[in-house]
């Protein structure tokens, strides 16, 4: 027997998805840095988001691999989008990143952020950054603070 979702629950899921899409579209429209870096939003849902970019020669450091800030920026953007999908204006208060594999020019990176835990005021997120071969090239963890403001009311 297949479990069924109650009609009211389906409506709630659809509403949460639409809110997530609206919030992220609004944030991306104002995010000139992410646009300049060539980032794209590839997936959005309640408390999750994925972003993508292709590493260009201008993004490499003196060792010929991508500067750590490239993966960090991509992961941080996915994190920001994911933790704002519930509609509250939410800000990063702590994050860290590990780079288990090199990133080279031409790599297409996808950062996928997911909520690991939530409280009334804090959200804890994990972001995996993978290359086009599916290899994890960066692991990011972030803590976010939920303000009292909602999207559309920010100053």
Task: Tell me what each language-model feature is.
Residues 1-155:
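Terminal targeting signals and extreme-terminal segments of soluble enzymes
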């Amino acid at each position: 027997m297949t479990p069924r979702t109650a009609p009211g629950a389906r409506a709630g899921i659809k509403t949460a998805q639409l809110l997530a899409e609206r919030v992220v579209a609004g944030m991306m429209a104002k995010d000139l840095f992410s646009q300049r870096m060539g980032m794209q939003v590839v997936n959005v849902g309640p408390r999750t988001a994925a972003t993508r970019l292709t590493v260009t020669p201008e993004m490499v450091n003196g060792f010929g691999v991508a500067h750590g800030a490239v993966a960090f920026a991509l992961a941080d953007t996915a994190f920001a989008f994911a933790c704002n999908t519930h509609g509250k204006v939410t800000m990063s208060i702590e994050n860290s990143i590990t780079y288990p594999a090199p990133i080279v020019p031409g790599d297409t990176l996808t950062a996928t952020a997911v909520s690991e835990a939530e409280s009334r005021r804090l959200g804890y997120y994990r972001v995996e950054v993978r290359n086009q071969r599916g290899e994890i090239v960066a692991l990011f963890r972030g803590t976010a603070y939920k303000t009292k403001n909602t999207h559309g009311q920010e100053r």
